[in-house]
């Protein structure tokens, strides 16, 4: 909307009046660049009237200093060069032009979360932000770090300049559809309502590899998808909320106990051979067979274990080796000599004394060769033998939490099972997972570290993975030691370490912010003669681990075209520089907490935009430090056409069951022995004949109902007698048979006795029911028994034949009482 030139002359304040800098113009005010004039003292002042969209008018003035280029540079941010080079610009006119161009090119984006780098990168590329209407419900599910970042983001938005050109452009696109959504969680948006043109930085159903329990279960299925062994790059893991998983973990713990005893013997002898001639604890165990004394308490004798412990451990390891080499396939379970529960408990307790109680094994030197040979065979078939160590430490993690929350390390099986049992009654299944702790990690200056490696998935069919060339290391604040199982020593998560102070005994060569870039790490390896290790072992192994994890999870993810997601994988290096995959994180933190993350996190976000946005228009564009890791051939899905589906053949006709003739039901004798007392003949009929209440209801809108023909012997009384008398009647039931359907008649229900043609029972209550003329049936009526009361002895006692029953098509009411249900899909209804 254009505004006419202001007729008022430029305002010049008196010399003694200080020029005030008034607030900038709101976005709905139109400016006229012709009204700018040069004021006193080299300052530009203006006073104009501008029409607003709602009809209001305001008088605003703005003053710009000739030497103040900060505001001008801020204005030019995100503006093409051809527009920003002009000295006389209407910022709101530029905002409208840029907005119209962005709408035409579908460059509208929305951000939920603290992602200033993504916002600035998209703005430089001509994208316009539509302010995201976030949901408080989604904010409740965020962690404390996410909430603080979101609060900071909201404060930054609130403190923005009101006349910021990007804020103006955001108001202009408030009714437009964003074509790029960048959120901290997928549930923030309605995932299934997105159009195919909208990009989202998340996929659905990624819990199969972004949660600890999902990755644990998926890695077991890896051999079905890839010719690879998950035990070569993923430490074995178990869920602790199912009995089968608990038993598998218990068996693994016990096997590790046996292998640790053998390792103790080998390590003890190797250590003794290096310290010959020195008075050491391990040397004295073999030189002096007598029980050793504690150096801190000489009067306390340390326990000494017999060689039977080593024999039992060798027996267990030999059986385990046979399982790994598949020698137990043709052997029955009854023939195997497994340890009893009591023997397992005894072996475990002796192991605790050996490792934690500083006990020794008598004559352990004689078992050295046997233990070394057996361990060598196990190592050749079990790639995790080296990382197991001798302490048998396991790390217990919540199944679906992140940032190191509630993670503990334990080395006693009873403590692990007790932790799960105490929490199993109030939690869902698979809340806890237990994973073998890497007891022999690579250390830098006696300090443990892990590696955060990014990778990007842009499609699941075909699976397309981009691997980032840069990564960073996270150090612990404490020196590494297995004597203490504190999280500060064994967990390198920045969310945990940032709350702790660096240990004074830690090497001063480590950075105070506890992070290195991968480039700095390569320099460290180069100085120690291991410069080629990164390119030959570490980097390729991390690539293979990520590729295998994504290929096995491909069938579980809810794939969506035009979506992408950036993940963060955590690795720990062993002593042999082999990386071990620990977990994969969705929505990895991009908070610039250290100088390292401030550099790399901003860099990886900018490069992500290059891959997912720029590469759509130019396949040869710059993609930063990303490299294509894996792209499989696309799997063509067969088209679905329901019209081609048909079934040919002849249907099987179900044979009709023939109704056998039913003989006379002898109810007369039983009724005569104990005749019921009823008020009327109708009540008598309903009491004796009607089916149970659970009978399936018949569809009363059918055009006709097939019924049975039967004969009932009953007295016919006058109306005055039926209302008040309480006689006892005999009721005779005779043979009945199927009758063919007759022609349809309309009228009232009419039932007439063949022997008493003058007596007619008419139901005016149900006019839709009617019957044909009854056929007489030859039979002998049973006389009623003598009874006291007002019963008339002269009452006629004659049979009434119910021949056929018809149902009117327009009938909306059903008869009152059901007398008999036939097997020929028909009903006989009583007379009310």
Swiss-Prot record:
Compositionally biased spans, kind Basic and acidic residues: 46-59, 66-75, 280-299
Broad class of where this protein is predominantly found: cytoplasm
Effect of residue 106 to E: Decreased monoglycylation activity
Record's subcellular location: Cytoplasm, Cytoskeleton; Cell projection, Cilium; Cytoplasm, Cytoskeleton, Cilium axoneme; Cytoplasm, Cytoskeleton, Flagellum axoneme
Catalysed reaction equations from the record: L-glutamyl-[protein] + glycine + ATP = glycyl-L-glutamyl-[protein] + ADP + phosphate + H(+)
The keyword Glycosyltransferase belongs to this UniProt entry's keyword annotation: no
Reported effect, residue 205 to E: Decreased monoglycylation activity
UniProt keyword annotation of Hydrolase present: no
Biased composition (Pro residues): 1-13
Site keyed Essential for specifying initiation versus elongation step of the polyglycylase activity: positions: 403
Effect of residue 225 to A: Decreased monoglycylation activity
Sequence positions that bind Mg(2+) 1: 570, 583
Residues holding a protein: 403
Positions of Mg(2+) 2 binding: 583, 585
Domain of life: Eukaryota
InterPro entries: TTL/TTLL_fam, TTLL_monoglycylase
Deletion phenotype: Simultaneous TTLL3 and TTLL8 knockout mice are subfertile owing to aberrant beat patterns of their sperm flagella, which impeded the straight swimming of sperm cells.
Result when mutating residue 185 to E: Decreased monoglycylation activity
Any GO CC annotation of this UniProt entry: axoneme
One protein family per Pfam: TTL
Function of the molecule: Monoglycylase which modifies both tubulin and non-tubulin proteins, adding a single glycine on the gamma-carboxyl groups of specific glutamate residues to generate monoglycine side chains within the C-terminal tail of target proteins. Not involved in elongation step of the polyglycylation reaction. Preferentially monoglycylates alpha-tubulin over beta-tubulin. Together with TTLL3, mediates microtubule glycylation of primary and motile cilia, which is essential for their stability and maintenance.
Record protein name field: Protein monoglycylase TTLL8
Species annotation: Mus musculus
Name of encoding gene: Ttll8
């Amino acid at each position: 909307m254009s505004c006419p030139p202001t007729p008022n002359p430029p305002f010049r304040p008196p010399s003694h009046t200080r020029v005030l800098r008034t607030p900038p113009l709101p976005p709905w005010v139109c400016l006229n660049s012709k009204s700018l004039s040069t004021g006193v003292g080299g300052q530009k002042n203006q006073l104009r009237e501008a029409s607003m969209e709602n009809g209001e008018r305001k008088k605003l003035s703005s003053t710009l200093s000739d030497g103040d280029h900060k505001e001008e540079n801020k204005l030019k941010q995100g503006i093409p060069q051809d527009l920003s080079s002009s000295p006389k610009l209407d910022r709101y006119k530029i905002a409208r032009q840029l907005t119209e161009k962005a709408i035409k090119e579908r460059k509208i984006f929305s951000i939920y979360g603290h992602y200033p780098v993504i916002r600035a990168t998209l703005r430089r590329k001509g994208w316009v932000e539509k302010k995201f209407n976030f949901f408080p419900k989604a904010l409740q599910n965020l962690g404390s770090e996410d909430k603080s970042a979101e609060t900071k983001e909201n404060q930054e938005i609130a403190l923005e300049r009101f006349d910021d050109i990007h804020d103006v452009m955001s108001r202009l696109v408030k009714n437009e559809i964003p074509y790029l959504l960048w959120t901290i969680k997928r549930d923030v948006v309605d995932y299934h309502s997105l159009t195919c043109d909208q990009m989202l930085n998340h996929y659905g159903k990624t819990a199969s590899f972004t949660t600890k329990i999902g990755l644990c279960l998926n890695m077991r299925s890896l051999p079905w998808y890839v010719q690879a062994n998950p035990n070569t790059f993923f430490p074995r893991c178990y869920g602790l909320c199912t009995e089968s998983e608990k038993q598998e973990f218990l068996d693994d713990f016990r096997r590790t106990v046996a292998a640790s005893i053998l390792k103790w013997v080998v390590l003890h002898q190797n250590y003794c051979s290096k310290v010959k001639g020195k008075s050491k604890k391990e040397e004295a165990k073999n030189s002096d067979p007598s029980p050793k004394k504690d150096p801190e308490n000489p009067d306390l004798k340390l326990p000494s274990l017999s060689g039977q412990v080593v024999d039992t451990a060798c027996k267990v390891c030999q059986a385990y080796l046979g399982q790994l080499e598949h020698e137990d396939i043709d052997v029955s379970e009854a023939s195997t000599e497994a340890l009893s529960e009591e023997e397992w408990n005894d072996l475990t307790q002796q192991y605790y004394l050996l490792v934690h109680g500083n006990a020794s094994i008598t004559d352990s030197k004689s078992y050295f060769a046997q233990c070394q040979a057996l361990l060598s065979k196990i190592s050749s078939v079990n790639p995790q033998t080296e990382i197991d160590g001798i302490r048998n430490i396991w790390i217990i993690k919540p199944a679906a939490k992140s940032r190191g929350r509630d993670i503990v390390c334990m080395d006693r099986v009873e403590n692990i099972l007790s932790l799960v049992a105490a929490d199993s009654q109030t939690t869902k299944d698979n809340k806890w997972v237990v994973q073998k702790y890497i007891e022999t990690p690579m250390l830098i200056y006696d300090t443990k570290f892990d590696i955060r490696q990014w990778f990007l998935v842009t499609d699941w069919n075909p699976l397309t993975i981009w691997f980032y060339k840069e990564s960073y290391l996270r150090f612990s604040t404490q020196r590494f030691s297995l004597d203490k199982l504190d999280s500060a020593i064994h967990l390198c998560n920045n969310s945990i370490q940032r709350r702790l102070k660096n240990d004074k005994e830690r090497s001063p060569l480590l950075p105070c912010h506890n992070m290195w870039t991968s480039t700095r790490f390569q320099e460290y390896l180069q100085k120690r003669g291991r410069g080629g290790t990164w390119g030959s072992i570490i980097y390729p192994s991390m690539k293979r681990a990520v590729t295998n994890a994504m290929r096995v999870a491909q069938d579980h993810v809810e794939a969506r075209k035009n979506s992408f997601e950036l993940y963060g994988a955590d690795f720990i290096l062993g002593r042999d520089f082999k990386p071990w995959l620990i977990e994969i994180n969705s929505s990895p933190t991009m908070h610039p907490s250290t100088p390292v993350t401030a550099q790399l996190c901003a860099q990886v976000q900018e490069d992500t935009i290059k891959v997912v946005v720029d590469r759509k228009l130019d396949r040869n564009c710059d993609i930063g430090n990303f490299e294509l890791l894996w792209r499989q051939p696309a799997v063509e899905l067969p088209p679905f056409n329901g019209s081609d589906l048909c079934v040919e053949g002849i249907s099987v006709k179900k044979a009709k069951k023939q109704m056998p003739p039913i003989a006379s039901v002898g109810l007369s004798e039983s009724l005569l022995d104990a005749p019921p007392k009823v008020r009327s003949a109708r009540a008598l009929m309903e009491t004796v004949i009607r089916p149970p209440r659970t009978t399936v209801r018949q569809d009363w809108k059918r055009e006709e109902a097939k019924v049975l023909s039967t004969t009932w012997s009953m007295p016919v009384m006058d109306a005055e007698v039926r209302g008040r008398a309480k006689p006892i009647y005999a009721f005779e039931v005779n043979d009945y048979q199927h009758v063919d359907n007759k022609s349809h008649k309309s009228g009232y229900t009419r039932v007439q006795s063949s022997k008493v043609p003058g007596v007619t029972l008419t139901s005016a209550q149900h006019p839709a029911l009617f019957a044909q003329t009854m056929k007489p049936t030859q039979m002998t009526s049973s006389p009623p028994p003598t009874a006291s009361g007002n019963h008339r002895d002269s009452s006629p006692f004659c049979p009434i034949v119910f021949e056929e029953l018809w149902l009117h098509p327009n009938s909306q009411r059903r008869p009152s009482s059901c007398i008999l249900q036939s097997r020929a899909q028909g009903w006989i209804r009583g007379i009310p």
